[in-house]
Amino acid sequence: MAPSKQADFLRALYQDWTDRMVADPNLSIANLRSMFDEWGQPALEPENVCYKSDRLGGVEAIWALPVGADNSRAIVYTHGGGFAVGSADSHRKLAGHLAKALNVTAVVLHYRRAPEHPFPAQIEDAVAAYKALLEKGFDATKLSTAGDSAGGNLAIASALKMRDLRLPLPGSVIAFSPWLDMALRGATLETNSTTDALVGRGILEAMAGMFLGSKTVPRDPLANPLENDFKGFPPLYLNAGGDETLLSDSETLHAKAKAQGVKTVLSVVPGMQHVFPALSGRAPEADEELGRIAAWYESLCFGHTHRQLRCGTNPTRS
């Protein structure tokens, strides 16, 4: 099935960003951040979701609070943007839609960004916020980490760091189009290079350089979760668009995690761009994907789901 007309909004936005970066390859980090703050445009404002600023473990954050949600459950959400751009504000609507779909709360972290703060500052901030929630009395099994693109990496890497620190692990991890391999070895970097409107090898190399800095190698097992061990990792939901260059990262992690005993789901929706759930409230493909995640979450937490899902996008799942 061809992508919906509404899904073209994201492709057009990404193409506009790409054109602007090609026209001015020396855009300052400040101008890049200003441009990528437009990431908040694709998602429509979720109905009956309130927002509140907070500070958790020293990290600035925005709570997304759906009316009637289970306040004992929360998502720690890390935004995308190559570890260097994007913000809690640019991603609050996406987090709000996810929280509403799961009937939980979400807290979107404005973690320290590269290049001013290279690895591992971002992971340190995510873990600090998570620990603050534990100190507030949250049950770890009722917490989830989630994120998109580079933030999907952080959602996964922060859980790995929690395991290393022997902290109670979150009950689940959700990653939209995670960028995992700082060594850039994925086959779809080449095979999907003409269908992905935003993410190519050049932009990834630049972002990886800012994130890793001068002291971290591309195959460091926390900066690059594909190099890590996933034994004992929480249940994992991976989502990707069929047209994106980072698809291989999700496929590789899914296979590795599954082989090591992780309860993992990979949902790939054909014809979709990078982080297409950013279209939540606008495009049916995004809303249907959130419905599938919600059904998975309900089954995971409660052993059943009452949801009736439309799967017109025909995702491939494994």
Label every model-predicted segment.
Residues M1-A69, V217, E298, F302-S318:
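A glycine/proline-hinged amphipathic helix-loop "lid/cap" segment
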Residues S72-G81:
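Short beta-strand element of the alpha/beta-hydrolase
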Residues S87-A88, L94, V107-K142, S280-A286:
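Catalytic nucleophile-loop/oxyanion-hole region of alpha/beta-hydrolase
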Residues G147, G151, A155:
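Gly/Ala-rich beta-loop-alpha elbow adjacent to hydrolase catalytic centers
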Residues L160-P218, G232:
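Hydrolase active-site cap/lid region
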Residues V217-P235:
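The feature captures the conserved acid-bearing segment of alpha/beta-hydrolase catalytic domains
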Residues L238-A240:
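Short beta-strand/loop motif that positions the catalytic acidic residue
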Residues T252, K258-P315:
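C-terminal catalytic histidine-bearing segment of alpha/beta-hydrolase fold enzymes
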